[in-house]
Regions:
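A low-complexity, Ser/Thr/Gly/Pro-enriched, surface-exposed linker/loop concept
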Residues: 69-101, 141-153
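Extracytosolic low-complexity repeat regions of secreted or lipid-anchored proteins
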Residues: 95-151
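C-terminal motif of bacterial Sec signal peptides marking the signal peptidase cleavage site
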Residues: 15-19
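Bacterial signal peptide processing site
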Residues: 21-23
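Short, low-complexity cationic-aromatic patches
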Residues: 40-58, 104-117
Length: 154
């Protein structure tokens, strides 16, 4: 319970900083680039094999999304930034290329999908191996790390 309160406090603090900060779009998460995103598999000490980006940062799915359509925008996307790509995403070590795809967000940017799930980062994950968003109930639904098959890791 205490860790959930700390996470909730971090989320509120992040929103306050974002609201009071400069016009920069920095969220503390990996910055979206025009390059093609790479999704790979890494071993997490607590969760086992999970999906990550090319830098080893954990990616998540949102259970509220339907099909490949993202439902996370505005304040949600500040806490859970989408994994963006400048073209077809690439499969890194352990990832299955046929499970990778994209969906077009309302702003026209391409978001990476895996096994039909739009992918997101969590703003509190700062380094490879962090998976602090696992199982959080936020913005009307649960957030899960993905297994190499693309299933939610419960």
């Amino acid at each position: 319970m205490k860790s959930r309160l700390l996470i909730a406090g971090a989320i509120v603090g992040t929103l306050l900083v974002a609201a009071c900060g400069s016009s920069s779009s920095s969220t503390g998460s990996p910055s979206p680039a025009a390059a093609r995103a790479t999704i790979a598999v890494a071993t997490n000490s607590k969760l086992g094999q999970i999906l990550v980006d090319a830098k080893g940062i954990t990616v998540y799915l949102f259970v509220k999304d339907t099909g490949i359509s993202s439902t996370c925008y505005t304040s949600c996307a500040q806490i859970w930034p989408p994994v963006l790509t400048g073209g077809p995403p690439q499969a890194g070590t352990g990832a299955t290329a046929s499970l990778l795809g994209t969906t077009t967000r309302t702003d026209g940017k391409l978001e990476v999908t895996y096994a039909g799930h739009p992918l997101y980062y969590f703003v509190s994950d700062k380094q490879p191996g962090d998976a602090t968003g696992q199982g959080i109930d936020n913005f009307g639904g649960l957030w899960w790390v993905l297994t190499p098959s693309g299933a939610a890791m419960h």
